[in-house]
Curated annotation (Swiss-Prot):
NDH-1 is composed of 14 different subunits. Subunits NuoA, H, J, K, L, M, N constitute the membrane sector of the complex. Its EC number is 7.1.1.-. This is NADH-quinone oxidoreductase subunit A. It comes from the Bacteria. Belongs to the complex I subunit 3 family. NDH-1 shuttles electrons from NADH, via FMN and iron-sulfur (Fe-S) centers, to quinones in the respiratory chain. The immediate electron acceptor for the enzyme in this species is believed to be ubiquinone. Couples the redox reaction to proton translocation (for every two electrons transferred, four hydrogen ions are translocated across the cytoplasmic membrane), and thus conserves the redox energy in a proton gradient. It is a multi-pass membrane protein. It comes from Herpetosiphon aurantiacus (strain ATCC 23779 / DSM 785 / 114-95). The gene is nuoA. Keywords: Cell membrane, Membrane, NAD, Quinone, Translocase, Transmembrane, Transmembrane helix, Transport, Ubiquinone.
Length: 118
């Protein structure tokens, strides 16, 4: 049993080490010579016109967050629907509770005006 956890620990350590090692090495090995040309904004081969930073409205983020939440809901709902015949009545109750919590959250967001578009 402990050897299974050792394999998971080694895999997790490798998953953290392999991406971070090149980043740390490149920070130490690359030349650091900032010039005004390197710090200038470059857009399609031309100098940027107007303000470089574009501010998005908060509503975009709220819609994106709602989409991610309900997208994850489908990730949980699909395996449940596939294996429903083997899971029984208790799994149905758990999924009803899960969907009720999400529905309450959707109604709350709707009442607060988070889904209103400007």
């Amino acid at each position: 049993m402990l050897t299974n956890y050792a394999f998971i620990g080694i895999f997790a350590l490798a998953a953290i080490t392999f991406p971070l090692l090149p980043l740390v090495l490149s920070a130490f090995l690359r030349p650091n010579r900032p010039t005004p040309v390197k710090l200038s904004t470059y857009e399609c081969g031309l100098e940027a016109i107007g303000d470089i930073w574009v501010q998005f409205k908060v509503q975009y983020y709220l819609y994106a967050l709602a989409f991610v939440i309900f997208d994850i809901e489908t990730v949980f709902l699909y395996p449940w629907a596939v294996a429903y015949g083997q899971l029984g009545l208790f799994a149905l109750f758990e999924m009803v509770v899960f969907l009720a919590i999400l529905t309450i959250g959707l109604v709350y967001a709707w009442k607060k005006g988070a889904l209103e578009w400007i």
